[in-house]
Structure formats: C-alpha cells, structure tokens
Amino acid sequence: MTVTGFFTDSTLCIGCKACEVACKEWNEVPADGYAFSGKSYDNTLALGHSTWRHVKFVEGETQAGAGGNLPDMLTWQFSSDVCKHCENAGCLESCPTGSIVRTEFGGVYIQPDICNGCGYCVVNCPFGVVDRRPTDGRAFKCTFCYDRQKEGETPACAKACPTQSILFGDLGELERIADERIAKLHSAGMTDATIWNPKDSSVGGTHAFFLVRGDPARYNLPASPEIPTTALKPAWSAAATAAGVLLGAALLGFALNRR
C-alpha cells in the first residue's frame, strides 16, 4: 500500500479557499459562522472541529507603491493549513479508547463512533489541530479523506485546488518534487523559501509538509514541535528508579530491625 501525503506550496496559493469549501462539502462539516474578527481578512482564523482545512492569510511588511498615485501596499502570503498526520502522533498515543488509528496510507484517523470526548488528544497535539465539537464533546480533524483514498480518489482539497498549491500522492515522490521546487525558487532569487517538515523533532516528520517564504512560525509551523507525551517517558523512568530506591531502603531497614 502506498504511503501518501500532502505537499503544500504556499508560493502558489492564491487564498481562494476552494480547498476549505471542498473539504466542507465532501465531509459534510458544519458551518463555522463565517464572521470577520477584525484581526485579519480571513474569516475562519484557525483549524478547528468545523474547519479541517484553513487558508491562512499572512500579512508581510509594507512595500512602496510602484509609482504615480499607487499607495503603499502590504505584502501577502497565503498557505492552506491542515492536520500534519505526524509519524509520531501525540493524539494517537494519548487516546485511551483506541478511537484514533493509523491508516494503511499513513494518515491519522479519528473514529467518531468510538471517541468518548475525553479531550486527551486535544492537549497532546503540538499544532493545536484537534478540536472538540461543543455539541457532543467528540474530537474532529482532517480525515486525510480516508474514504476517498480507499476508492483510489484524490482528497477533496487537493482535487479542488486551482493552482496545484496542494499536491497529493506518494510521500517519497512529493519530497522529491519539493526538493526540485525549492531549488528552482532559490535559483530565481527567492532565497527565503524553505521546506518545513520537522523530521528531527519528536513528531518524527509529517505526512503534510509545506514550502513557505520567510519564518515558518508565521504560518503556524513551529521550528521544533514536540509531543507532550515524550516528557512522560523519562519522568516515569525517574519515578520508577526513585520507587525502587525507597523500596530497597525500606527492605534494608526491615532486615536490620529484625536483627
């Protein structure tokens, strides 16, 4: 079975939100309310229980007008954000019911009929992707269009993208395409373009990676994301060692007292 992924090239994104609409239509995701917040021209703001694809509007520094009566203009970058489907997924590791599973395509899938709404997955996602629906408390996020992939179909968001900013396919092939694309941009003078795929962090790489210009953190892509559960392993080890020492001391004291 082919291990698949998303490669999102933000330099090709035009902010049309076709991916958001296609995702909602295919998955029958409830409406968000669509109200402007005053913080941005974006009307969905972030990923959540009812927004599984989110086109982020990133405002850059003001550039001088091209002459004449043209005003100074903000620079804009757009990027379509989504669940990263981490290799080491904190949500999956922390789920107590087995609701969250790894599919044969490599994606991380929440089975809503098993989810008990405990929320452990929410706090263990390093990207703030997983969110609980307020009506019943169950957790929701991008499904990687598992139903479409099983039928050999492309996920709705990638199929709807008019500029091929969102590419879907074999993960290894997408990484090769990304390397070629970044080399082309650098040769064209866009030296601030970079690939974000945190393979050296505790998430171990992702099945959704991005090409962005400037600091990836501006696109809600942290430089070194960490899974909260990784801190538990040394903590449990230290606790077990301490318990062993205390037990040994107690047994030694008991033996000495019997003499």
Language-model region placement:
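Non-ligating segments of multi-cofactor redox enzymes
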Residues: M1-R259
